[in-house]
Curated annotation (Swiss-Prot):
Signal peptide: none
GO molecular function: monoatomic cation transmembrane transporter activity; sodium ion transmembrane transporter activity
GO biological process: sodium ion transmembrane transport
Family listed: Belongs to the TrkH potassium transport family. HKT (TC 2.A.38.3) subfamily.
Tissue distribution of the protein: Weakly expressed. In roots, expressed in epidermis, exodermis, cortex, and sieve elements and companion cells of phloem. In mature leaves, expressed in large highly vacuolated cells of the adaxial epidermis, phloem and xylem.
Gene Ontology cellular-component terms listed: endoplasmic reticulum membrane; Golgi membrane; plasma membrane
Listed name of the protein: Cation transporter HKT1;3
Catalytic activity: Na(+)(in) = Na(+)(out)
Lineage: Eukaryota, Viridiplantae, Streptophyta, Embryophyta, Tracheophyta
Database matches in PANTHER family: CATION TRANSPORTER HKT1_3, POTASSIUM TRANSPORT PROTEIN DDB_G0292412-RELATED
Annotated organism of origin: Oryza sativa subsp. japonica (Rice)
Positions on the Cytoplasmic side per record topology: 1-46, 129-190, 285-321, 404-421, 515-530
Complex and partners: Interacts with CNIH1.
UniProt-annotated location(s): Endoplasmic reticulum membrane; Golgi apparatus membrane
Annotated domain remarks: HKT transporters are proposed to contain 4 pore-forming regions enclosed by transmembrane segments with each containing a potassium channel-like selectivity filter motif.
């Protein structure tokens, strides 16, 4: 009897070991299958991956915002407005249909996370992670039997020129390697990933600390937040991440208008905005250059010498970085000069000192590309400035005047001609904007008929371009502009879109997503010839 029990026990133990090994083997196989399947989809249809990513975080944010209670528990937010806000934060658009002070501290933290993981720097860091996964089983790119084309928002070769506006060209790593005369080691990509992560941490934590210190040292700014019941830590972290991510949200209803006389605070935020978008590439190159001087690492030297070989679009040559910086600075100066020339004695800058006016003009000019924070009521600005801002919001972040040398059109522009032909038949950005404006004019036609001063074509165009550029500027809605006075009308601090119908808001959600993914259509519409 005992012998039978011993034999049964041994058989059971053997079966357990066998089952455990098979289960472990199955788990590893499943993980590899999922990994390689995802890599295959990512390489062949990265647009699908990006759409899925932003849809996932947007709906996750929507669910979190719905579960958490707003500040005023009796004020129930509409489902569409909550989804709109979640998409707006995820796509760093800062378009608003509800007042920010309606959200509780817990909900503000959710929006902070959405702005962080939806920002350009963070998503580009994810791109580097997938690039590392692609090289995980190889010693280096040069030893690969084939070099797949990776068409991803951050892993692209970007050509700059007077007519390209940062045209994205999909190229294989082998072609990049031949063009640049080197090869990429996996450890170099890993190092770059750590550099971008460090950049993200330094800008966000450093920005939060600077804002926190200012609010503690300046009683007038501290009193504003105390009066509104907003914690300093929440405001500091939220505003810093929003600024670096170029989202444009702030925890207060008035955005930065309430701090328009706190010029030092505005000047502290300006570098964060530039470092997170239009000057990210030059700042990243400066960081790599500094690390090379301090550590002498070969990886830094390689990245500086062959930025295109990495395949990370935010890595630029010295020449490209200089021209991009000059373009950004020139556009800021142009906007600031025009703003001060036209608005110096206007209502928008009323009550400010000369110094505060200059800082406010500079702040507005920087935010037009593409952060969206504001220190003035845009509805009080002249039409010329609003047209200027519309143009600035339309321009891509890396728009640069870069004179092209003879022979600069290299092999990369000849690759994937078949795909380029398909892209030519896709509508251009201007075509999409025209379609979206027409659709919203249709959904809001009743309001345009009864309230033409608020619901006019330019206001709708301004709102659509702002959403498509992921900026967040809005001319707002004013009860004073009603033709027939309505005692029930109440002015609100949120954007003009907050007064739109549900259909109009739904279309604007699509516009924000289109705008966040517009880098996949930088060459669209070339088949259309106007003669």
């Amino acid at each position: 009897m005992n012998h039978c029990l011993v034999v049964s026990h041994k058989k059971l133990q053997t079966f357990r070991t066998f089952a455990a090994s098979k289960f472990s083997s199955f788990t590893k196989s499943a993980q590899k299958s999922i990994k390689y399947s995802f890599q295959f989809i990512y390489q062949n249809n990265p647009l699908f991956v990006h759409v899925a990513y932003f849809a996932l975080i947007s709906f996750a944010g929507y669910g979190s915002l719905k579960v958490l209670k707003p500040r005023d528990k009796s004020n129930t937010l509409k489902d569409l407005d909550v989804l709109f806000t979640s998409v707006s934060a995820s796509t760093v658009s800062s378009m608003a249909t509800v007042e920010m002070e309606d959200f509780s501290s817990a909900q503000l933290w959710v929006l902070t996370i959405l702005m962080l993981i939806g920002g350009e720097v963070f998503t580009s860091m994810l791109g580097i992670h997938f690039m590392r996964a692609e090289f995980g089983t190889k010693e280096s790119v040069s030893t690969r039997d084939h070099s797949p084309c990776i068409d991803i928002e951050s892993i692209t070769s970007t050509k700059f020129g007077p007519s390209t506006q940062g045209t994205k060209v999909t190229v294989s790593f082998s072609e990049l390697r031949m063009e640049n005369g080197g090869h990429v080691e996996p450890k170099t990509i890993k190092f770059l990933g750590f550099v971008v992560m460090g950049y993200l941490l330094i800008t966000n934590l450093g920005g939060s600390l600077l804002i926190y210190l200012y609010l503690n040292l300046v009683p007038s700014a501290h009193k504003i937040l105390k009066r509104k019941g907003i914690g300093i830590i929440v405001f500091s972290v939220f505003t810093a991440i929003s600024s670096v991510g170029n989202c444009g949200f702030t925890p207060v209803n008035e955005n930065m208008i309430i701090f328009q006389k706190n010029s030092i605070l505005l000047l502290l935020i300006l570098p964060q905005i530039l470092a997170g978008n239009t000057l990210f590439a030059p700042c990243l190159r400066l960081m790599v250059w500094s690390l090379e001087k301090i550590t002498g690492k070969k990886d830094c030297r390689y990245i500086l010498e062959y930025p295109k070989a990495i395949g990370y679009k935010h890595l630029m040559s010295t020449r490209e970085s200089v021209y991009l910086t000059l373009t950004v600075v020139s556009l800021i100066i142009l906007q600031t000069v025009l703003f001060l020339s036209l608005e110096w004695s206007s209502v928008a800058l009323d009550g400010m000192s000369n110094y505060q006016k200059i800082v406010s003009a500079l702040f507005q000019s920087v935010n037009a590309r593409h952060a969206g924070e504001s220190v003035t009521d845009l509805s009080n600005l002249s039409s010329a400035i609003l047209v200027l801002y519309t143009i600035m919001m339309y321009l891509p972040g890396y728009t640069s005047f870069l004179p092209r040398h003879d022979g600069e059109d290299s092999k990369t522009e000849k690759i994937n001609k078949r795909k380029g032909l398909l892209e030519n038949w896709i509508f251009s950005h201007m075509s999409y904007l025209a379609i979206f404006v027409m659709l919203i004019c249709i959904t809001e036609r009743d309001s345009m008929a009864t309230d033409p001063l608020n619901f006019n074509v330019f206001s709708i165009l301004f709102e659509v371009v702002s959403a498509y550029g992921n900026v967040g500027f809005s001319v707002g809605y004013s009860c004073k502009r009603l033709l027939n006075h309505d005692a029930r009308c109440k002015d609100a601090s949120y954007g003009f879109a907050g007064k739109w119908s549900d259909n109009g808001k739904a279309i604007l959600i699509i516009v924000m997503l289109f705008g966040r993914l517009k880098t996949f259509n930088m060459k669209g519409g070339r088949a259309w010839k106007l003669r």
